[in-house]
Amino acid sequence: MKFVFEARMKPGYSVDEYAQEWIRASEIIQQSPGALGTYLHRKIGAPDTVMAIAHWESKGHRDAKDDHRNSIVHAILEKHAQKCEITVIGEFEEAEWIVLPQF
């Protein structure tokens, strides 16, 4: 499954600052059972906005992780809650329909 959210930086906080903290938290979160990686994308035309896509074995695995178990992750998420506007886009199943280029 995919968990997708957008983060828009408030004035005075940069995407690069966000990304540094996001990487620190993500490295810890990725130690959780069922974690399959996470990606951070810059939004074209909006230099203060990124989209994160976290990959999990299942919704159950994602729901079972506990961000409060680690003080570093908890502190980073609290900081992001103050410095960014976070919009959850949603939780998505793995793709049912895939078209890839044929070479």
Question: PLM features: what roles do these ranges have?
Answer:
Residues 14-15, 49, 88-92:
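Intrinsically disordered, low-complexity regions enriched in Ser/Pro/Gly/Gln/His and often acidic
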Residues 8-20:
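Short, surface-exposed ligand-recognition loops at beta-strand->loop->(often short) alpha-helix junctions
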Residues 24-36, 55-91:
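An amphipathic, aromatic/His-enriched active-site/gating alpha helix that lines ligand/cofactor pockets
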Residues 94-103:
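Short, low-order "capping/linker" segments at domain edges
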Residues 2-9, 38-70:
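Short, well-ordered beta-strand segments in beta-rich or mixed alpha/beta enzyme
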Residues 6, 92-94:
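Short amphipathic
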